[in-house]
């Protein structure tokens, strides 16, 4: 694993860090953060105490230093060479709030698990949130990628999103300003979402519970929920199901090292042991190539891949073609 010099970066931020209340960790292992349990080090990890602390810290970080944010670590593949700059990891204490915000409205912090908002909606007879019960991860990620499942998606429920930009300025975005599309948000990539307001509608609790039970049963039956996985690996292309294309290309159960396309649901990539970020990404790229050769359809990654390759293990060079 490549060693980085996070302490040097931390020292370069100057005396202003003394006023920061959150936790700063140089050379932080990302394999302890992601659901894949793989990947290199973050040069410097910051866990802000709250939004005010996040704002204060961002004002200290020079513009040339890269900054990225992670939530619970689902839907994220970190390369073995690690992540340069600052990784901001939001904590439940400062960003996990969940409360009613008016009639049929819910306020949820960015690190709040998706399934928790579904549970609160059930408790209060608010319809439209059942689908979150089957989505791994947190609200921040759902806002960023317009997460959805079982005929529901985030964009249908969002009213407004609160965020902080790279310079520490606060923003409030409407649903229109989020620019939602399929598994995509057009909001600036530099924005760090802190919380959002969602709106549903009055619905009978028995109906909500029935819908949530159906989501749970489906997920437990067809998804490898007890494995080390980041969720769906590829987006569904227009007119196709990614899993079916993968299956037809003969990639169900395919393995490279300790990385495998799940035999249970072949659009889920799993770490069967001590898979490296390289093995996971190489497997994904091999599947993309085979699907293209078999059906002529280009699969797009749904998993977010970040960080640097280890020298000599660049996926682009190894496959001899563009990766994405």
From Swiss-Prot:
Name the reaction it catalyses. UDP-N-acetyl-alpha-D-muramate + NADP(+) = UDP-N-acetyl-3-O-(1-carboxyvinyl)-alpha-D-glucosamine + NADPH + H(+)
Keywords attached to this Swiss-Prot or TrEMBL record, sorted alphabetically, are: Cell cycle, Cell division, Cell shape, Cell wall biogenesis/degradation, Cytoplasm, FAD, Flavoprotein, NADP, Oxidoreductase, Peptidoglycan synthesis
- GO MF terms held by the record: FAD binding; UDP-N-acetylmuramate dehydrogenase activity
Question: According to its UniProt record, where is this protein located?
Answer: Cytoplasm
Q: Where is the FAD-binding PCMH-type domain?
A: 36-203
Q: What is its EC number?
A: 1.3.1.98
| Pathway connected to this protein | Cell wall biogenesis; peptidoglycan biosynthesis
Q: Name one GO cellular component term.
A: cytosol
The cross-references to InterPro entries, in alphabetical order and at most eight, read: FAD-bd_PCMH, FAD-bd_PCMH-like_sf, FAD-bd_PCMH_sub1, FAD-bd_PCMH_sub2, MurB, MurB_C, MurB_C_sf, Oxid_FAD_bind_N
Q: Which cofactor does it need?
A: FAD
What residues make up the catalytic site? 183, 232 (proton donor), 302
GO BP terms: namely: cell division; cell wall organization; peptidoglycan biosynthetic process; regulation of cell shape
User: Which Pfam families does this one have?
Assistant: FAD_binding_4, MurB_C
What PROSITE patterns does its record include? FAD_PCMH (PS51387)
What does the protein in this record do?
Cell wall formation.
Instruction: State the family it belongs to.
Output: Belongs to the MurB family.
Protein name, entry field: UDP-N-acetylenolpyruvoylglucosamine reductase
Task: Record the organism.
Answer: Rhizobium meliloti (strain 1021) (Ensifer meliloti)
């Amino acid at each position: 694993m490549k060693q980085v010099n996070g302490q040097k970066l931390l020292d370069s931020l100057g005396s202003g860090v003394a006023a920061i209340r959150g936790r700063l960790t140089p050379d932080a292992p990302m394999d302890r953060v992601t659901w894949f349990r793989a990947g290199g080090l973050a040069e410097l990890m910051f866990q802000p105490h709250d939004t005010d602390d996040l704002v204060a810290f961002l004002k200290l970080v020079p513009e040339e230093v890269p900054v990225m944010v992670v939530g619970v670590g689902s839907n994220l593949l970190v390369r073995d060479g690690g992540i340069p700059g600052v990784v901001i990891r939001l904590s439940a204490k400062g960003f996990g709030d969940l409360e009613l915000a008016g009639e049929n409205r819910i306020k949820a912090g960015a690190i709040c698990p998706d399934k928790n908002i579904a549970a609160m909606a059930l408790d209060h007879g608010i319809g439209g949130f059942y689908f979150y019960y089957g989505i791994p991860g947190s609200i921040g990620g759902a806002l960023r990628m317009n997460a959805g499942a079982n005929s529901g998606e985030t964009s249908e429920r969002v009213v407004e999103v609160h965020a902080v930009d790279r310079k520490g300025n606060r923003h409030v975005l409407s649903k229109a300003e989020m620019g939602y599309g399929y598994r995509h948000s057009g909001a600036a990539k530099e924005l760090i979402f802190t919380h959002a307001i969602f709106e549903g509608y009055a619905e009978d609790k028995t109906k909500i519970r029935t819908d949530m039970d159906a989501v749970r049963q489906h997920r437990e039956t067809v998804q490898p929920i007890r494995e080390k996985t980041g969720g769906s690996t590829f987006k569904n292309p227009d007119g196709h199901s990614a899993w079916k294309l993968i299956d037809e290309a003969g990639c169900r159960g395919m393995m490279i090292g300790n990385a495998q396309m799940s035999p249970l649901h072949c659009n889920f990539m799993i770490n069967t042991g001590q898979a490296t970020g390289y093995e996971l990404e190489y497997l994904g790229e091999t599947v993309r190539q085979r699907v293209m050769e078999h059906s002529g359809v280009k699969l797009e990654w749904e998993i977010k891949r970040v960080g640097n390759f280890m020298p000599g293990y660049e996926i682009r060079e190894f496959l001899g073609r563009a990766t994405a």
